[in-house]
Amino acid sequence: MAGASRYAVYLKPAAERALKKVKDDTARRRIVKAIDGLTTNPRPPGAVAIQGGDGLLRIRAGDYRMLYTVDDDALAVLVVTIGHRRDVYQR
């Protein structure tokens, strides 16, 4: 059996800005670890499809949520936004 496929992970500019705004170092590390995990498993346990999100998935990292899409043909993950759980869905 061949090695596991690795997905390339891309962040939209808004997601990059949101990640930089996370002031809590522990939370930021948790988010980065979750993003890194998407390279080997773009649909980890706990990933949930967003209703009405046109293919958007959500993963949790503490109090933060990441919304992203997966392109299996291109082996790519696009992180659309990162935000605190209280306001990430309001966009």
At which residue positions do the language-model features occur?
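Basic, Lys/Arg-enriched alpha-helical interface segments
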Residues: 1-63, 71-78, 86-91
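Residues forming the ATP-binding cleft of Hanks-type serine/threonine protein kinase domains
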Residues: 83
